[in-house]
Design a protein with these regions (language model features):
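Short C-terminal tail/terminal secondary-structure segment
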Residues: 2-12, 171, 254-255, 266-279
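Canonical Rossmann dinucleotide-binding motif of NAD(H)/NADP(H)-dependent dehydrogenases/reductases
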Residues: 14-46, 50
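Substrate-binding pocket helix/loop in short-chain dehydrogenase/reductase
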Residues: 122-123, 130-135, 234-235
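Active-site helix of classical SDR
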Residues: 146, 182, 190
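Residue(s) in the substrate-gating loop at a strand-loop-helix junction
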Residues: 166
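Short, small/polar-rich loop/turn modules that mediate ligand/substrate recognition or access, typified
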Residues: 198, 203, 265-267
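A conserved structural motif in NAD(P)-dependent oxidoreductases
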Residues: 238-250, 261
């Protein structure tokens, strides 16, 4: 495993150097930005992404090439990067990815449950397939990944789990009932894990961004026959005069929450909403 001190990684002030992060939904968007931000702090990365199209919601996902270029960019920072093409709903694939990460990198210090989807539809008109896909990817997926990582964190008596929820995990949203249900569920799971895992020195925090300028936002716009800006403004309505935040804004929060600077933050909701929830 490369020594971060010998690579091109700049000096870290976060206490993260040498740690290992496992990130889902890592090929693009918030996951990719977070992987790169952590790598700049000297963190080794295990990147998981489905890396193929999904029947629902129907917009483009990350690709195997995205994973490859992420690995190249992370390694260029002087740290290791493992990549896994795996669906968070596939327990066998996730179990294998976690086992390989432990074997190759020795531990998992940080879990960023970021993989997720979004789609529109009135709740009473959704198909069962749409409902199940949303809940299984956005809520069951983090649970599947978490239950494979948590025993290792318990054994090492430390760890940080960051679950990427949404402002929709703190309020209701029209035509996003299944999405909101999945994100509220993730908020509840985060709080419950925080209670259960605190005795083992493990912190758990949920993140709640407003709309983010990612390929998912572009895909939703295409499905709706609208521009990304129209979708962002329709879905969000931020207090600050911006249609969205950037993936790097979420990545900055991930670095902070994973670091020693946040050592007493657990069981809470970290809101990055450009003031939306204040309206």
């Amino acid at each position: 495993m490369p020594d971060p001190a010998q690579g091109s990684t700049p000096p870290s002030t976060t206490g993260l150097r040498g740690k290992v992060a496992l990130i889902t939904g890592a090929a693009h968007g918030q996951g990719r930005a977070s992987a790169l931000a952590l790598a700049r702090e000297g963190v080794h990365v295990a990147a998981i992404d489905v890396a193929k199209p999904l029947d629902y919601p129907g917009y483009g996902m990350g690709t195997s090439r995205d994973l490859e270029t992420l690995a190249e960019a992370v390694r260029a920072l002087g740290v290791e990067c493992l990549t896994f093409a795996a669906d968070v709903r596939d327990d066998a694939a996730i179990t294998a990815a976690v086992a390989t990460t432990i074997e190759r990198l020795g531990k998992v210090d940080i879990l960023f449950n970021n993989a997720g989807i979004c789609g529109y539809g009135l709740a009473h008109e959704l198909t069962e397939e749409a409902w199940d896909a949303m809940i299984d990817i956005n809520l069951k997926g983090p649970w599947i990944v978490g239950r494979r990582v948590i025993p290792h964190m318990i054994a090492q008596k430390s760890g940080v789990i960051l679950n990427n929820s949404s402002i929709a995990g703190l309020r209701g949203m029209g035509r996003l009932g299944h999405y909101a249900a999945s994100k509220w569920g993730l908020t509840g799971l985060s709080k419950s894990w925080a209670i259960e895992l605190a005795p083992h020195g493990i912190r758990v925090v949920s993140l709640h961004p407003t709309g983010v300028n990612t390929p998912m936002n572009d895909g939703l716009a295409e499905l709706e026959g609208a521009t990304p800006r129209e979708i962002a403004e329709r879905s969000a309505g931020n207090l600050l005069p911006v249609p969205w935040i950037e993936p790097e804004d979420v990545a900055n929060a991930v670095v902070f929450l994973a670091s020693d600077q946040a050592r007493f933050i657990t069981g809470s909701e970290f809101v990055i909403d450009a003031g939306l929830l204040t309206r």
